[in-house]
């Protein structure tokens, strides 16, 4: 996957991803209109399909709501790369079908850098800077869940194959 980096700092909580006042919505498309509204008001209008959210440590901390990864999915972000994730956000993102990769080198990535990410190997190529970083690749079974679009779609596939 290839996309432009949207850079965020440490401790980006789920209220920053999608403010609580928008929890009345539950579809990815509707939530996408308000993604990062309080911290990056330009995000929803300027994010392009396959763009990549890049952050520091503890991305997705705070409330354990599925609305945050749903908003990212609705924004058509191809993946989220962070130094670390709040565990409940990490799991919710997988369940929703949003790829998440942990990479210690996110400080080297700047807002607007063009990235190419190989989810299967965890290799991140920064095309803007000519650098390569190594993220922790997702285990095969987790990648299968993400590839199917989330846990529900993955379960449907397993049932249909029986």
Curated annotation (Swiss-Prot):
GO terms for molecular function: 3-isopropylmalate dehydratase activity. GO terms for biological process: L-leucine biosynthetic process. Its EC number is 4.2.1.33. It is an enzyme of class 4 (lyase). It comes from the Archaea. CDD domains: IPMI_Swivel (cd01577). It catalyses: (2R,3S)-3-isopropylmalate = (2S)-2-isopropylmalate. Keywords: Amino-acid biosynthesis, Branched-chain amino acid biosynthesis, Leucine biosynthesis, Lyase. Gene3D superfamilies: Aconitase, domain 4. Catalyzes the isomerization between 2-isopropylmalate and 3-isopropylmalate, via the formation of 2-isopropylmaleate. Belongs to the LeuD family. LeuD type 2 subfamily. Heterodimer of LeuC and LeuD. This is 3-isopropylmalate dehydratase small subunit. It comes from Methanosarcina mazei (strain ATCC BAA-159 / DSM 3647 / Goe1 / Go1 / JCM 11833 / OCM 88) (Methanosarcina frisia). The gene is leuD.
């Amino acid at each position: 996957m290839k996309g432009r980096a949207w850079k965020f700092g440490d401790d980006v909580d789920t209220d920053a991803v999608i403010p609580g006042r928008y929890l009345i919505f539950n579809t990815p498309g509707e939530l996408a209109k308000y993604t990062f509204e309080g911290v990056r008001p330009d995000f929803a209008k300027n994010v392009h399909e396959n763009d990549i959210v890049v952050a520091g440590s503890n991305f997705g901390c705070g409330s354990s709501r599925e609305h945050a990864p749903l908003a990212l999915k609705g924004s058509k972000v191809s993946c989220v790369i962070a130094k670390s994730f709040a565990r409940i956000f990490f799991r919710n993102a997988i369940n929703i079908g949003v790829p998440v990769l942990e990479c210690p080198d996110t400080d080297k990535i700047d807002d607007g850098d063009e990235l190419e990410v190989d989810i299967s190997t965890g290799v991140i190529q920064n095309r803007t800077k000519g650098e390569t970083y190594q993220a922790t690749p997702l285990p095969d079974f987790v990648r299968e869940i993400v590839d199917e679009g989330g846990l529900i779609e993955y379960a449907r596939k397993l049932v249909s194959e029986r």
